């Protein structure tokens, strides 16, 4: 269900964000650009943010922002101006796009939520927290180097239930299994609910969610 019934009429997201606006929230989905990475575990951040933008009438269409190294959508939800971005830098340079957007739109780095895969968490779980280690995730490492660690993280488990004989970097670059694909609509629905809580609430949630049915 959508929150608002009409998309913004302007085609330029900068019209929404000028100096002095006191509550702008940045949503970041991590992934790698390119069709060959679509549908892979490592791109689950892109997947979830795409679904959020598609299902939220208040958010505008994706626009390419070459100067900010990302695809960007914007809108207003409740009393929060929202910018959603997908870095187009490849995963290990994601912080460049995040830093560019934060600087250009003068966003408080603590009003940021990053959606990303996490191999150390089993598929079916989403863990929410502010800060923490990168757990070897190069995208998170890049963002933290760029802006510090005081941002919210939506950590989507992609870990296998049983050990697999494959390197971690190869496993996350594989597409979701057929059984996992059947659960992705539940995943994106839960992430949308988490983002709604964050945008309408005062603080970033800190708990664990399960989306398997």
What are these regions (language model features)?
Residues 137:
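Conserved glycosyltransferase catalytic-site signature
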Residues 170-184:
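Active-site-adjacent mobile loop/cap segments within catalytic or ligand-binding domains
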Residues 134:
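Conserved TIR/SEFIR loop-to-helix hotspot centered on a Trp-containing motif
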Residues 157-161:
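Short loop/turn motifs enriched for small/polar and acidic residues
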Residues 2-131, 141, 145-152, 162-167, ...:
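Nucleotide and nucleotide-moiety/phosphate-recognizing core
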């Amino acid at each position: 269900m959508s929150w608002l019934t009409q998309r913004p009429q302007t085609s330029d997201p900068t019209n929404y964000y000028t100096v002095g606006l006191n509550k702008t929230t940045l949503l970041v989905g991590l992934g790698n650009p390119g069709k060959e990475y679509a549908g892979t575990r490592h791109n689950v951040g892109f997947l979830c943010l795409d679904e959020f933008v598609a299902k939220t009438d208040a958010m505008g269409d994706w626009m390419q922002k070459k100067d900010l190294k990302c695809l960007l959508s914007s809108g207003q939800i409740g009393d929060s101006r929202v910018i959603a971005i997908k870095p187009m830098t490849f995963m290990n340079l994601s912080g460049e796009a995040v830093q560019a957007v934060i600087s250009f739109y003068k966003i408080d780095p603590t009003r940021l939520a990053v959606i990303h895969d996490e191999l150390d968490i089993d598929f079916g779980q989403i863990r929410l927290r502010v800060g923490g280690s990168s757990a070897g995730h190069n995208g998170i490492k890049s963002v933290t180097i760029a802006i510090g660690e005081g941002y919210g993280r939506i950590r989507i488990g992609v870990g296998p239930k049983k050990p697999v004989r494959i390197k971690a970097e190869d496993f996350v670059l594989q597409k979701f299994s057929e059984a996992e694909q059947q659960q992705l609509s539940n995943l994106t629905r839960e992430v949308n609910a988490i983002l709604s809580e964050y945008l309408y609430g005062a603080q970033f949630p800190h708990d664990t969610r399960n989306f398997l049915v």
